[in-house]
From Swiss-Prot:
Pathway: Pyrimidine metabolism; CTP biosynthesis via salvage pathway; CTP from cytidine: step 1/3; Pyrimidine metabolism; UMP biosynthesis via salvage pathway; UMP from uridine: step 1/1. This is Uridine kinase. It is found in: Cytoplasm. One of its GO terms (cellular component) is cytoplasm. It comes from Borrelia hermsii (strain HS1 / DAH).
């Protein structure tokens, strides 16, 4: 059976950075990002901040669970893709064929018990709030077409509250907590070595 490694943490904590670095070392691992399971806002004009992207209900949780369950059963899936500029799901999907170990990353992947039960190793990236905010600000402005004002307003109105209400409490479910995500070379080396061994030797660790 496929082993699923979950990497969670607040927005800007360094999840994607760690995953990208792991992928450079171990390219045979498949990555599934929870970001692709955001619900479409719709094809109409709206006030962006009326949509709370920092709440579990912002995700298509049923689809996320069903597809992870298929991955766990070594079945291929067609993963959705999300357009963060237009805030809707794209028409195209990506075919994902499971590898022995699959990495799943996202801010709320530990929120639902049914999803947690599918994850064999739970990793939480614990990064200071100011660092996370700066990273989120840079990312949203450079890659998601956001303005400085909109990012700050969203952070103050929903992101900060969502982190303390939904994300930080899931730290208690983690098997491993990594501080300073994305810039912790020692932790990255240990994690990469472990995943490489796991991919070769299978389920001996679980």
């Amino acid at each position: 059976m496929v082993k699923i490694i979950g990497i969670a943490g607040g927005s800007g904590s360094g999840k994607t950075t760690i995953v990208n670095k792991i992928s450079e070392v171990i390219p045979e691992f498949v990555l599934i990002s929870q970001d692709n399971y955001y619900k479409s806002v719709g094809d109409y004009e709206y006030e962006f901040l009326d949509v709370n992207f920092d709440h579990p209900d912002a995700f298509d949780n049923n689809l996320f669970y069903k597809q992870l369950k298929k991955i766990k059963e070594n079945k291929l899936i067609h993963m959705p893709l999300y357009d963060f500029i237009n805030h809707r799901r794209k028409d195209e999907t990506v075919e994902i064929v499971p590898t022995p170990v699959v990495i799943v990353e996202g801010i709320m992947i530990f929120v639902e018990e049914r999803v947690r039960n599918l994850i064999d190793l739970k990793i939480y990236i614990d990064t200071p709030n100011d660092i996370r905010f700066i990273r989120r600000l840079e990312r949203d402005m450079s890659k998601r077409g956001r303005t400085l004002e909109s990012v700050i307003e969203q952070y103050l109105s929903t992101t900060r509250a969502g982190y303390y209400r939904f994300i930080e409490p899931t730290k208690e479910y983690a098997d491993l907590i990594i501080p300073e995500g994305g810039h912790n070379d020692k932790a990255l080396y240990v994690l990469s070595s472990f995943l490489r061994t796991l991919g070769k030797e299978g389920a001996d660790f679980f």
